[in-house]
Amino acid sequence: MSGVTYRVTGINLKAMPLGEADRIITILTREQGLIRAVAKGSRKQLSKWGGRMEPFVVNDLLVARGRWSAQTDPSQCLQRIAQAETLQSFPRLGRSLAHLTAAQYLAEVALLLALPNQPQEELFVLLVEHLERIEQAPATEAVLPLLVHGLYHLLVVGGVAPSVQACYSCGEELAGEAFFSPHAGGLVCDPCRLAQRLSPVAWVSSSVLQALGSLPNPTLPSLAERALPLASWLAAERLLRRVLELHADRAIRSAGLLASCYSVPVAETLPPTPSGQGSPVAAAAFSEEDSETLGSNLKKL
């Protein structure tokens, strides 16, 4: 196949060094989904690219496909960025570790859910929208609910979102307390849990249930209006994360710093398992932490 060029709009999600001066950039585009392209010279101090190849930068790109045989899968071939014009960036994501952690988390989720060589308009628009909301968050406490909200909406687009308002089995609206099974489909009422003998499951408190129930809404209430403990949002994040990790068969490395960002002991973020309710295995299932730090993860971007 002879080399051709094409234009796309994309956001930089990941970068890897290539040789002494270049980078391989992984980009989520509206038109072609995930693409990997070489930005030649982007590691040089006086690179012509400036900041255009940095993470979370949205560019209008001219990409050269390169040359390969007809038997080669294009998704496995490196392309080359010929031109880039910045359309949007998120400089205020660097104001705190919490902002950076949340942005990197959503970028990692998008990488897991995006498909190559096909349009990803909805995923692209949704990711940019939630990064904008996180960037505008005035305080660390406001970031976490926005992260969980964005995570849920990305799972919806990816077709793997769990039930968060009603029992996935019987459809009954839930209030007070409930259970959560990442393997079975999300929230489940006690009668269905017992009838189906689900294990492991996590017991979900009323505050965590309230956090989960707000996620399908287009926007969250203001920080003053929602007034839920940070531990409830951390617990909700862990439940959603477990669903994604089961689907992707890999850990979300960016989640490692969430608890430390908010000074909440890990034990407080775990849905408790009262005596006779749920399975003690649930605590272990939802307490695995990745050993990677955000710092090492950001270096890979």
Curated annotation (Swiss-Prot):
GO terms under biological process: DNA recombination; double-strand break repair
Gene that produces this protein: recO
Protein name: DNA repair protein RecO
Taxonomy of the source species: Bacteria, Bacillati, Cyanobacteriota, Cyanophyceae, Synechococcales
Pfam families xref list: RecO_C, RecO_N
UniProt cross-references to HAMAP family, sorted A to Z: RecO
Matches recorded under SUPFAM superfamilies: ArfGap/RecO-like zinc finger, Nucleic acid-binding proteins
Task of the protein: Involved in DNA repair and RecF pathway recombination.
Organism per entry: Synechococcus sp. (strain JA-3-3Ab)
Family according to the record: Belongs to the RecO family.
NCBIfam families, alphabetized: reco
Keywords of this entry: DNA damage, DNA recombination, DNA repair
Superkingdom of the source species: Bacteria
